[in-house]
A protein has these predicted regions:
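Conserved lysine of the Walker
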Residues: 36
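Short, flexible loop segments at the rims of nucleotide/cofactor-binding pockets, characterized by
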Residues: 94, 308-310
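An accessory alpha-helical subdomain
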Residues: 123-212, 225
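H-loop (His-switch) motif in ABC-type P-loop NTPases
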Residues: 334-336
């Protein structure tokens, strides 16, 4: 799968852009704050129906403007597909595939698989369990629609149970139906997470070793209440209800799962250097790519946002070697250092294109495909 063309109007600092992409390597060069990451965020939005920054839709509309639109043209398994997004603050979001509006946006997740490697991935190591659960859920949801359905059902039931706890409800019958729903979905969620961690572990270790190549031993494991308690979630909820009534929320369940990250038998957050942490998160994302490629039976888009920061020259060289391989499909790379991008393009025999990014405008610098077409003309920012 690859994104052939992208049209953007009023997305963050991008007033107007019309870009035609290489099916392999696309590089974006520019200083910080110029719009490189915003371009990747637009591509991410078309796959996930939301920004990777966590901003609300209304905050994505360019300052001073009243709407935003995006249109992406894809080659998906040899079939032309088009996605369209329209946002008008205060109105319902429009998200169309092939001109048809989605009834449920959750039905879109996984249809256009994508893996993002970004500076915020540091939170996978240093952040809370919520960050690592989000990572698990995003990956598995793209490959298993039923998993996403169970996440939604569990989340709704969890909110209902928490409301009963806050209202100091004491009638056991009020909890029964809710907790039965939670248990059914929790069993599926936990099983899917366990299987995913087991499959990811070996792939992740191989990528880490290829980048680090210094004998470091990484490992990951799922930390789950249900894995440690075979009696099921309802038994756990019953045993903790008195405590939950006091604190006003549910203290056990998949919403409290975590991933333990280890390096040489020590927690990564305590023992690893910045370079080791960066290597760790990149290896996790590349393992995610392999997992999704096999599950979806197509190559996801790979977005690499400022990935070379905090890596020494040797690890940069090894990473460039990895992402230049044919196992990866279409790649979007941003950097402030032209040498990094030139090195990637020189190492790859594949088609490539590169742009200079300044204040939300994109100027084609180089293309292995020859002369630019109309889509590649620099887009001028409107004047007041």
């Amino acid at each position: 799968m690859h994104l052939k063309r992208l049209a953007i109007t009023n997305f963050k600092n991008i007033a107007d852009a019309r870009l035609r992409f290489s099916p392999k390597i696309n590089c974006f060069l520019g200083n910080n704050g110029m719009g490189k990451s915003n371009l990747l965020d637009a591509v991410h939005y078309l796959s996930f129906c939301k920004s990777f920054t966590g901003l609300a839709d209304a905050a994505l509309v360019k300052r001073g403007e009243e709407f935003l639109t995006m249109r992406g043209e894809y080659d998906r398994k040899g079939v032309d597909e088009e996605l369209q997004v329209g946002l008008l603050p205060g109105k319902r979001k429009s998200f169309k595939r092939g001109g048809k509006e989605y009834d449920r946006l959750s039905a879109h997740i996984g249809a256009f698989p994508l893996v993002l490697v970004a500076p915020a991935d540091q939170e996978l190591v240093s952040g809370t369990g919520e960050e690592r659960r989000r990572f698990m859920d995003q990956v598995i949801s793209q490959t298993d629609p039923l998993y996403l359905d169970h996440l939604i059902r569990y989340g709704r039931a969890l909110q209902q149970r928490n409301k009963l706890l806050r209202d100091h409800a004491v009638d056991p019958s009020l909890y029964l139906a809710i907790e039965m729903t939670m248990e059914r979905s929790a069993a599926y969620i936990t099983r899917a997470r366990q299987e995913w961690v087991e499959r990811l572990t070996g792939i992740f270790g191989r990528y880490y070793e290829r980048i680090a190549a210094d004998g470091e031993i990484p490992s990951i494991s799922l930390k789950s209440h249900l894995s440690e308690n075979p009696d099921g979630l309802m038994a756990l909820l019953d045993s903790t209800r008195r405590h939950d009534e006091i604190v006003g929320h549910t203290s056990v369940g998949p919403h409290r799962d975590d991933i333990d990250l280890w390096l040489n038998g020590m927690p990564v957050r305590r023992a690893a250097s910045q370079g080791q942490c960066k290597t760790y998160t990149i290896a996790l994302r590349l393992a995610q790519y392999d997992f999704m490629r096999e599950a979806a039976r197509m190559k996801p888009l790979l977005l690499l946002d400022d990935i070379f920061d905090k890596l020494d020259a040797t690890r940069v060289e090894r990473l460039v070697e990895i992402v230049s391989e044919d196992i990866f499909g279409q790649i979007f790379i941003t950097d402030t250092n032209r040498d990094h991008l030139d090195h990637i393009m020189s190492r790859s025999a594949n088609d490539h294109r590169s742009w200079m990014v300044e204040e939300g405008t994109f100027t084609l610098m180089a293309s292995s495909a020859g002369e630019p077409d109309a889509d590649d003309a620099p887009q001028q920012q409107p004047t007041a």
